[in-house]
Amino acid sequence: MEPEAPDSRKRPLETPPEVVCTKRSNTGEEGEYFLKVLIPSYAAGSIIGKGGQTIVQLQKETGATIKLSKSKDFYPGTTERVCLVQGTAEALNAVHSFIAEKVREIPQAMTKPEVVNILQPQTTMNPDRAKQAKLIVPNSTAGLIIGKGGATVKAVMEQSGAWVQLSQKPEGINLQERVVTVSGEPEQVHKAVSAIVQKVQEDPQSSSCLNISYANVAGPVANSNPTGSPYASPADVLPAAAAASAAAASGLLGPAGLAGVGAFPAALPAFSGTDLLAISTALNTLASYGYNTNSLSLGLNSAAASGVLAAVAAGANPAAAAAANLLASYAGDAGAGPGAGAAPPPPPPPGALGSFALAAAANGYLGAGAGGAAGAGGAPLVAAAAAAGAAGGFLTAEKLAAESAKELVEIAVPENLVGAILGKGGKTLVEYQELTGARIQISKKGEFLPGTRNRRVTITGSPAATQAAQYLISQRVTYEQGVRASNPQKVG
């Protein structure tokens, strides 16, 4: 890929990270509209061209104005840049067709598993991405795309032959935007995107969010994937989830392995629930920019961890750098504490979540195999499960959650991944319920969330139980997706 030369034109391709989310007309100048598209980093260079020549020519041919986020300014949770296209409906469709063509030219090296390096975001690409279009639309436009009872999106899929999925809509919170994923063959995707552009034309508020940088966006941002959490990087993390995430970084604070993870609560006697929330938020921020936080728990002492995090901060964008610096500060505090260098204390007494952690580690629910598979992805997940259990014990001691309160959580799981949660004869699902104390129900086969091929999973129980169950299911789904992405022959 050619390096991007400085742009001398009056209207730059890359604009400052301004955040624009306001009520305004859906058109620009004389019938012009706006379309926001996600572009994988591997395709950005071919879209821009040497010295910006390709994109300049594209603007001349279509009459559109095209802006891209800066080269390292990715949409949260991805390594994809944000492209904002302004023009007539015909121009929007023409520009997107060009972008889609470049996205389909996925380099072969991008589909191969790579060695995880905490210093750089991961760049391994799901091969399915080449057949997808990802559009970011305001919440109001998303409603028009879905239609009453999902009728509109169903019609779009039937007429185009493409799959159209929207990122999940959270309960009680209105995200400014949602991400639409269109999958299929080139002509199918083109037809579906054209139908979406038509909805953009119909929505008076379709131009309410024109920012191309999300580095300074406050509050939750929509997940770029249609499955899993509605959020790309949660801004508000419940205490149980906060501690679970913080525990996953136990390698910053002590010995490697499950013993070190089990010792995590005792290693932070002076850190409050607020500290844990800050640590969790920082970890989520790094994860949202593609950094593998699991690799921080590989036996680094506090001094070594601080060095690794300093290296991350030196090469990251401002948001990720701030998160790395914060974690380095906590690692330094832990290393300077009275327990630094001491032998790890025994694991906490197994409570509800403690039992879940120990059983998960023993039975390898998240390991899903031995040998290479476990080495590639199983061990960190087992450690993370144990970390969640350790965090649960810590929260019980701190009384950060009212365990008696009942809570209902709904998450979406892709149809083709439900089997991973059910297990043979439903055994895995039963075990999840026994380990967490939560009740887990999955919608019947063929009953999907509107506009998706996702089954509804309802989790009921105490806050700690629902958080543990949600964490376990999400990690299982994430792990299974990773295995399938690296091994396309694996089915079920």
From Swiss-Prot:
What does the UniProt entry report for the null mutant? Knockouts are born indistinguishable from littermates but failed to thrive, demonstrating progressive motor dysfunction and overt motor weakness, and they die an average of 14-18 days after birth. They have agenesis of the corpus callosum, and axonal outgrowth defects specific to ventral motoneuron axons and efferent innervation of the cochlea. Conditional knockouts in excitatory neurons die between three and four weeks old and show disorganized cortical and hippocampal CA1 and CA3 laminar structure.
List the ranges annotated as motif Bipartite nuclear localization signal.
10-26
Pfam families named in the record: KH_1 (PF00013)
Q: In which tissues is it expressed?
A: Expressed in brain cortex. Expression is enriched in excitatory neuronal-linage.
**Which domain of life does the UniProt lineage start with?**
Eukaryota
GO MF annotations in UniProt: mRNA binding; RNA binding; sequence-specific mRNA binding
Stored CDD domains:
KH-I_NOVA_rpt1, KH-I_NOVA_rpt2, KH-I_NOVA_rpt3
Q: Which InterPro entries match?
A: KH-I_NOVA_rpt1 (IPR047275), KH-I_NOVA_rpt2 (IPR047276), KH-I_NOVA_rpt3 (IPR047274), KH_dom (IPR004087), KH_dom_type_1 (IPR004088), KH_dom_type_1_sf (IPR036612)
Q: Which residues form the KH domain?
A: 32-99, 130-196, 406-473
Which residues are in coiled coils?
none
Name one cellular component (GO) term.
nucleus
GO BP of this protein:
central nervous system neuron development; mRNA processing; negative regulation of cold-induced thermogenesis; neuron differentiation; regulation of alternative mRNA splicing, via spliceosome; regulation of axon guidance; regulation of RNA metabolic process; RNA splicing
Q: Where in the cell is the protein located?
A: Nucleus
**Chain positions of cross-link Glycyl lysine isopeptide (Lys-Gly) (interchain with G-Cter in SUMO2):** 112
Give the UniProt keywords, A-Z.
Isopeptide bond, mRNA processing, mRNA splicing, Neurogenesis, Nucleus, Repeat, RNA-binding, Ubl conjugation
Q: Does the keyword Manganese apply?
A: no
Instruction: Quote the subunit structure annotation.
Output: Interacts with PTBP2; the interaction is direct.
Q: What is known of its domains?
A: The third KH domain (KH3) recognizes specifically 5'-YCAY-3'.
Family matches, as PANTHER family: KH DOMAIN CONTAINING RNA BINDING PROTEIN
Q: What task does this protein carry out?
A: Functions to regulate alternative splicing in neurons by binding pre-mRNA in a sequence-specific manner to activate exon inclusion or exclusion. It binds specifically to the sequences 5'-YCAY-3' and regulates splicing in only a subset of regulated exons. Binding to an exonic 5'-YCAY-3' cluster changes the protein complexes assembled on pre-mRNA, blocking U1 snRNP binding and exon inclusion, whereas binding to an intronic 5'-YCAY-3' cluster enhances spliceosome assembly and exon inclusion. With NOVA1, they perform unique biological functions in different brain areas and cell types.
Protein name (Swiss-Prot/TrEMBL): RNA-binding protein Nova-2
Q: Which organism is it from?
A: Mus musculus
